């Protein structure tokens, strides 16, 4: 990955690419929505398929010369069906948000009702936030997690559904560290004759590997992104029963997108094949095991965790008890200076600004891809504690940063 052709044409971009390569090699990617793809996926996404316009679907294109585009997209679809057990799969969405958009376009009219989890409680912008198109086109009501336990309040969700009578109930979250009971949410949706969209963007890989229960076959629609825990490059995916297949396909194209990004679909195909290898199941289990070790280590250092722990790839830390004067954004900045990259995050009962909230969200998918095990994760938890306890100490931040570089050198990404 020396980008020799880029350097000949545009040294400034080549320098930025080289800098980003070095940054990824020398820092811990602990933003829960980030991961590292293989060199095979990188190569597929940088292939000549970027040149090909392929509006339509395999066998039904609007342009000639799509025989290899058809082959690649069909491989991606078939592999996705095998991974998740879905009847119908659309691999063309450019992102998880656009996958959600396709579902809304397929079954909702402007002004219809969405019931979803509040963003401060772990939801997502594309589930109805006022700043997002969903909050501007549809009527939105939101449910919450239980204030005492941090778990989804399923009873409150059912009551909200009965009172609000939504057209669609959205499950699946961006900052919820516990197992989701898809059947419980489906029952709430069924009781009010609503559709159920399960957004598994964060846990696509965990679901594929069987370390988290699957909503496929339970929810009417399942969406996800392909670059978090599945390691198939940037993009989105929609899964559904055959009865909704035509509506979903039309909502993706021509409803919300034009030509698909065939180079990204090639990356999806390659990443899905990698995920079908038995070694991926071991990886996904290690992601969860590492998150559990990290959670226990942080708790031992006195940190409060939303829900008291984790069942998946992320740990959500509420700093208000242990560090009441330290906003999550400031903690994240100090950790980034020490080469530990994560993000400030809102927490249930948020009292600060979303731009500098009360929590930090820590993910283990990226560091598990490096090969970190339980012992290393315990040390990472110790390092996070050192920095958060000493955000104003340049010496501590430097020392932790040096140790992080050593850990990265011991577990390189791309050799």
Curated annotation (Swiss-Prot):
GO biological process assignments: glycine biosynthetic process from serine; tetrahydrofolate interconversion
Signal sequence, start to end: none
Annotated site, Plays an important role in substrate specificity, chain positions: 227
A Pfam family hit: SHMT
UniProt-annotated location(s): Cytoplasm
Cofactor(s) listed in the protein's UniProt record: pyridoxal 5'-phosphate
Listed transmembrane segments: none
Name of this protein: Serine hydroxymethyltransferase
